[in-house]
Amino acid sequence: MGKLTLLLLTLLVWLQYSLWFGKNGIHDYSRVNDDVAAQQATNAKLKARNDQLFAEIDDLNGGQEAIEERARNELSMTKPGETFYRLVPDASKRAQAAGQTNR
């Protein structure tokens, strides 16, 4: 009976070692779980960005308002009869802002 107990105990130790430290063991499972979580977070960010881009594409395809808004903001374009005003801060405020960014 002692040999059988020793054999079973040895088998148990070997199986536990394989479970904890062997290939596809607990450590590998934990590492893969972390990798999957990181990839899912990245995928969620990219999906949100894609949804935003698709919404912008639909907006640009759907009407002139989005195109007009981009032309006004990016190209400083105006409609006929409109006057474009650009507000420039005082020289003292510009110098103060420049001094803060250089620090």
UniProtKB/Swiss-Prot annotation:
Q: Which residues form a coiled coil?
A: 31-62
Question: What's the superkingdom here?
Answer: Bacteria
Q: Which Pfam families match?
A: DivIC (PF04977)
Upper lineage is: Bacteria, Pseudomonadati, Pseudomonadota, Gammaproteobacteria, Enterobacterales
Instruction: Give me any GO biological process, just one.
Output: FtsZ-dependent cytokinesis
Q: How does it sit in the membrane?
A: Single-pass type II membrane protein
Instruction: Please describe what this protein does.
Output: Essential cell division protein. May link together the upstream cell division proteins, which are predominantly cytoplasmic, with the downstream cell division proteins, which are predominantly periplasmic.
Transmembrane stretches, start-end = 4-21
User: InterPro entries, alphabetically?
Assistant: Cell_div_FtsB, FtsL/DivIC
Cytoplasmic topological domain ranges are 1-3
This protein is called Cell division protein FtsB
Q: Could you tell me which species this protein originates from? A: Citrobacter koseri (strain ATCC BAA-895 / CDC 4225-83 / SGSC4696)
The protein's UniProt keywords, in alphabetical order, are: Cell cycle, Cell division, Cell inner membrane, Cell membrane, Coiled coil, Membrane, Transmembrane, Transmembrane helix
Per the record, its GO cellular-component terms are: cell division site; cell septum; plasma membrane
Fetch the HAMAP family from UniProt: FtsB
